Amino acid sequence: MSGWPRIYYKLLNLPLSILVKSKSIPADPAPELGLDTSRPIMYVLPYNSKADLLTLRAQCLAHDLPDPLDPLEIDGTLLPRYVFIHGGPRVFTYYTPKEESIKLFHDYLDLHRSNPNLDVQMVPVSVMFGRSPGREKGEVNPPLRMLNGVQKFFAVLWLGRDSFVRFSPSVSLRHMADEHGTDKTIAQKLARVARMHFARQRLAAVGPRLPARQDLFNKLLASRAIAKAVEDEARSKKISHEKAQQNAVALMEEIAANFSYEMIRLTDRILGFTWNRLYQGINVHNAERVRQLAHDGHEIVYVPCHRSHMDYLLLSYVLYHQGLVPPHIAAGINLNFWPAGPIFRRLGAFFIRRTFKGNKLYSTVFREYLGELFSRGYSVEYFVEGGRSRTGRLLDPKTGTLSMTIQAMLRGGTRPITLVPIYIGYEHVMEVGTYAKELRGATKEKENMAQMLRGLSKLRNLGQGYVNFGEPIPLMTYLNQHVPEWRESIDPIEAVRPAWLTPTVNNIAADLMVRINNAGAANAMNLCCTALLASRQRSLTREQLTEQLDCYLDLLRNVPYSPDATVPSASASELIDHALQMNKFEVEKDTIGDIIILPREQAVLMTYYRNNIAHMLVLPSLMAAIVTQHRHISREALLHHVEVLYPMLKAELFLRWDRDELPDVIDALAREMARQGLITLQNDELQINPSHSRTLQLLAAGARETLQRYAITFWLLSANPAINRSSLEKESRTVAQRLSVLHGINAPEFFDKAVFSSLVLTLRDEGYISDSGDAEPAETLKVYQMLAELITSDVRLTIESATQGE
């Protein structure tokens, strides 16, 4: 480019460089989209806009991609490196230049016909200034319409810092030429497909138009389901129809979001400013699979784990910066206090009560509102655990909202609904101290303004944040496979509960929890806490801690927990340095070296972070515990031990493997442990390696408390086979509390009611407890004897003495 065009672009770039601060999606386009910079690249943009072109150019130069203003020279032919699909309007709408996109596509395809070695990568790129979806009434033109020069000027002026450049996966023109030919009709088809691609991308980024709030309420009131519920309310409470209708409207006011794009923009600025100071980085993985779902027109339901109140803001912030619409979020009614409630509502929160029981009108209004969100195409987010995890582990799922999601499908909607499990991880959770108090019996403090300000005042260095998108569950595909007759239950008017609904919802919920854990994120904090809590003194020398972290990292890298799980790329030493900056540990220096100590008062709090990744290390920890106690054991005996205990572990930690997959997983882990020198592996015999016994013992300690808990319950069951489930849970907790005091066990979840409740249910499912409440004494005793070999003699004596004299 030379002469006047260069001067023109330089002059235009001056104000743009000041006004525009765009973000690239994905953050690093070349590696994330598999672009090969050694091969020719050309860019396709939806509209003829020099502002868009220069904004794209800035991102290309920042990411070492070819400059779109530099023409491509192919076989002596110079062609522009960019193509505008549409000429775009001008100030004077009757003057529109002739589109050149089809001619340029044809020129590029023609070059491929004459040069069989040529393969140009065509990269669709959309540049967006602002993402307001607009309202259903009041605007004639669609959002993100083509802007003329004056409109574009004001868009850049007002929204230049809320802009992003979205790179899409490349299309091989060589493939197009070989598969479809190179004539002009193919060029026209290519331009038409590109137009559809950009239209879908706009919808994914902006979302459907927002309804006027009162219009939405009127539509809901007119629905037959709510009309019937209002009549029932009037009849059952002996009130007038008008009063019952007012009650329904009051419930809508309580529930419904009041989404505001301007509030999203403002909050994005505040969060961007705040999190750059609080977090050292927010790591996002597998976002492309969600962008693809949105592009393909799926109704997306985000289902994250729930660690902190920060989850609401973090996920919306991440999705917004991934070029997606922030979802409507189901938030607990406890957060509907001033000023947080109105703010959250404008950020897309709709509020849900803890229970729907005994209030038919409320459940009907909520179900119809949720169904309306789905039918309008809004993405939705809810926490399937129902509340924040106090222990750092996943809670058993609450299936009410999930059941309503499937009932929404049974209304006969056309858009496919897809559930997206999400793992959210932190190196610091601001509520962790409160969680520990609540687990010790303190009453949960009601959320209010003062509590929120206290929490904000404590925010300091939060380390890294992690948002990992798991493997989606397309509901239509799932139902087609597991409930082929599901379409017979479609009823566009009444909410139906076919016989298959409850078991199917329970299975989907369990699958979601497994997929959330599959996307787990190991980090410096949870790895260091795992190692230090494994030490009985809660302290290790720096060399010992480095060695232990190397063990964990090698296990997680060489035998990955799942394809979606993430492991730090940093070295063990770098992770320790980072963890020390979080000010959770103490360092004592002597003439030999550093000793890293987890203070007693911090130990209980740090179990939270260890529990975040307990599922990723529990199987190698269990294997290490078995080998450590037996000194040497055959592969068959090891496999038998694991297979007996695995159903309890799978139910408690939502592990991913089926029982028939265990032999291969155990073999892979055994080979890795042998490679590390932790054990020797010869003739299907596993034997402890004395020179690495400390590392193996620390690895084994990860399963220590779980085995002790199982031993308590199996001992009580074998000592009293006729004990009922309720008493078994209660007595197990009592013995666990006693054990934690006598043996200094600092983990709050050690005697958590939910953990023992889940364990007893699994024992029933596995046949250790029959439907009549009687255990199988012989089998129960065998399992206890196996567990007794894996725990220390003093712990065993405490457990067995707890039932003596009864």
From Swiss-Prot:
Pathway participation: Phospholipid metabolism; CDP-diacylglycerol biosynthesis; CDP-diacylglycerol from sn-glycerol 3-phosphate: step 1/3
CDD domains linked: LPLAT_DHAPAT-like
Pfam families to which the protein is assigned, alphabetical: Acyltransferase (PF01553), GPAT_C (PF19277)
Matching SMART domains: PlsC (SM00563)
Annotated keywords: Acyltransferase, Cell inner membrane, Cell membrane, Lipid biosynthesis, Lipid metabolism, Membrane, Phospholipid biosynthesis, Phospholipid metabolism, Transferase
Major localisation: membrane
GO cellular component: plasma membrane
Membrane-protein topology: Peripheral membrane protein
Main EC class the enzyme belongs to: transferase
Tagged with keyword Transferase: yes
Catalytic activity: sn-glycerol 3-phosphate + an acyl-CoA = a 1-acyl-sn-glycero-3-phosphate + CoA
UniProt-listed GO biological process terms: CDP-diacylglycerol biosynthetic process; fatty acid metabolic process
Position of sequence motif HXXXXD motif: 305-310
Matches recorded under SUPFAM superfamilies: Glycerol-3-phosphate (1)-acyltransferase
GO terms assigned for molecular function: glycerol-3-phosphate O-acyltransferase activity
Subcellular location: Cell inner membrane
EC number: 2.3.1.15
Cross-referenced InterPro entries: GPAT/DHAPAT, GPAT/DHAPAT_C, GPAT/DHAPAT_LPLAT, GPAT_PlsB, Plipid/glycerol_acylTrfase
UniProt-listed PANTHER family: DIHYDROXYACETONE PHOSPHATE ACYLTRANSFERASE, GLYCEROL-3-PHOSPHATE ACYLTRANSFERASE
Domain notes: The HXXXXD motif is essential for acyltransferase activity and may constitute the binding site for the phosphate moiety of the glycerol-3-phosphate.
Recorded family membership: Belongs to the GPAT/DAPAT family.
NCBIfam families: plsB (TIGR03703), PRK04974.1 (NF003441)
Protein name: Glycerol-3-phosphate acyltransferase
Native organism: Escherichia fergusonii (strain ATCC 35469 / DSM 13698 / CCUG 18766 / IAM 14443 / JCM 21226 / LMG 7866 / NBRC 102419 / NCTC 12128 / CDC 0568-73)
